[in-house]
Every structure is written in C-alpha cells, then in structure tokens.
C-alpha cells in the first residue's frame, strides 16, 4: 500500500497550469486555515488576469490538527466586517456547488473557482 505523506492542489486549467500548492506543508507550519483568491494576501493566491471570475477572497480550505483531511468552503471570514463573505461566482467540487458549510475533499476531486480548475491530490 502507498504511504500518503500529504495533500496538495494542482492547477489543471488556468493561467498557472501545473502550479502545485503543498497543503500539508502549510499545515506543518501551523496553518490550518488556508485562503484562496485573486488577491496576493491569500495564502494560495490564484492568478486570473483574463477575467475576474475568481473573487479577491474566494474560498477557504481547513484541515484537522492531524492533517488527515481537508474541507473546502465557499467564501472567507472578513475580520473587519465580522462577517462570512461568499464568493461572487461560487466554488464547485466535481461540478456541485459548495456552501459555507463546506465539503470534505477526496483525492481526485476537481475544484472549480472561476475559470480555474484544481485537482486535490496526495503524495
């Protein structure tokens, strides 16, 4: 049996095709909540210059203390306004819309945000 060392997200479609985000590396360094979006202040900034379908603060990934699974949620917590703000165009996993309540990712899942598609993988 294959030993899983960690989890990552690989961009499969979009301006940064092939880019790899090592999610487990973030978790190792104490980051259990990762933000994804167009703005550079996200822990996982996604470049989308051809359109603006990816929100500035699009979605959130969260892991357990053990790092054995990840949950994706549409939107991000906005500290200043003290409110959860959903993305403009939604977050999808395998073409199904994800809400703020979240979805537990499985290896091979395809995440779509705007025109960008990413695959959840293990290594």
What are these language model-derived features?
Residues 45, 59, 65-110:
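Forkhead-associated
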Residues 55-57:
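Short, solvent-exposed loop/turn segments enriched in Ser/Thr/Gly
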Residues 1-52, 62-67, 106, 111, ...:
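Intrinsically disordered, low-complexity acidic Ser/Thr-rich regulatory segments
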């Amino acid at each position: 049996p294959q030993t899983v060392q960690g989890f990552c997200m690989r961009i499969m479609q979009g301006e940064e095709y092939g880019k790899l985000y090592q999610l487990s590396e973030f978790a190792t360094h104490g980051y259990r909540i990762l933000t994804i979006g167009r703005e550079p202040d996200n822990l996982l900034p996604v470049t989308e210059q051809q359109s603006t379908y990816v929100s500035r603060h699009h979605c959130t990934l969260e892991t357990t203390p053990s790092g054995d699974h990840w949950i994706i949620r549409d939107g991000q917590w906005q500290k200043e306004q003290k409110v959860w703000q959903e993305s403009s165009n939604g977050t999808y996993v395998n073409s199904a819309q994800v809400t703020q309540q979240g979805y537990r990712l499985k290896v091979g899942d395809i995440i779509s945000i705007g025109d960008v598609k990413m695959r959840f993988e293990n290594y």
